[in-house]
C-alpha cells in the first residue's frame, strides 16, 4: 500500500505543477480494463474477493494517455478491494454510452456516509477512512484519478450508500469512427 501511496503522491505533485506530460494514443479499453483487473486477482484472493469483469467482446477505442488511464483503474480497483468484505465480489465493467467509454468499479463494502461523500473529490478537505482490514485511505488516490480523467476529457463520479457499497465510474470520449 505504501508504494502505491508514494507513486500517487509523486504523480499528483507532478500533475499539479505541470510537470506531468499527457501522451495521447489510440487504445483499446477492453484490453486495458482486462489487463489491470487481472493484476489484482491475487491481491483480491487474499481477502477471498472475486474480481468479476463485465466488458464487451468488441474493441472500445479511445484516444487517451494509457498510463493515466491504467493508474485510474488501478486506484479504483485497489480501493474497492480495500473496502470490500471477505467473500464478496468487485465488479469491473466497461460500456459505451453517448459517445463515451464508461468504466465502473463496484464494491460490496461499507459504503460512504453522506458527510464524507461531500468531502470526497475535493482538494480542500481531508479525512481518513479505514478498509475492512483496517487499511487507511486518505482520498489522495481519488483526487489523482479525478485529475487524470479530466486531463483525458472525461469525468469521475460515484454513487454510494452507507452499508451498501460504492460504485466509482469515469468516462472518457470514444475515438471518433
Language model segments and positions:
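Coiled-coil phosphoacceptor/dimerization helix of two-component systems
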Residues: 1-12, 32
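Helix-loop junction within the histidine kinase core
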Residues: 13-24
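Conserved catalytic submotifs in the C-terminal HATPase_c
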Residues: 23-28, 34, 45, 50-60
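Short helix-loop "hinge" at the ATP-lid/N-box region of the Bergerat-fold HATPase_c
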Residues: 80-81
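Short conserved segment of the HATPase_c
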Residues: 112-126
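Short alpha-helical Gxxx[C/S/T] motif in the catalytic ATP-binding
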Residues: 136, 141, 145
Amino acid at each position: 500500500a505504501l508504494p502505491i501511496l508514494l507513486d500517487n503522491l509523486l504523480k499528483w505533485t507532478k500533475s499539479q505543477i505541470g510537470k506531468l506530460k499527457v501522451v495521447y494514443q489510440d487504445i483499446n479499453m477492453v484490453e486495458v480494463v482486462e489487463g489491470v483487473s487481472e493484476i489484482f486477482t491475487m491481491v483480491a484472493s487474499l481477502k477471498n474477493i472475486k474480481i468479476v469483469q463485465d466488458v464487451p467482446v468488441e474493441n472500445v477505442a479511445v484516444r487517451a494517455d494509457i498510463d493515466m488511464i491504467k493508474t485510474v483503474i488501478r486506484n479504483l480497483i485497489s480501493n474497492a478491494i480495500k473496502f470490500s468484505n471477505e467473500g464478496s465480489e468487485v465488479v469491473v465493467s466497461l460500456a459505451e454510452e453517448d459517445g463515451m467509454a464508461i468504466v465502473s468499479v463496484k464494491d460490496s463494502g461499507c459504503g460512504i456516509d453522506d458527510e464524507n461523500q461531500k468531502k470526497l473529490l475535493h482538494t480542500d478537505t481531508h479525512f481518513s477512512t479505514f478498509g475492512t482490514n483496517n487499511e487507511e485511505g486518505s482520498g489522495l488516490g481519488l483526487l489523482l484519478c479525478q485529475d487524470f480523467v479530466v486531463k483525458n476529457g472525461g469525468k469521475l463520479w460515484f454513487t454510494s450508500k452507507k452499508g451498501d457499497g460504492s460504485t466509482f465510474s469515469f468516462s472518457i470520449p470514444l475515438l471518433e469512427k
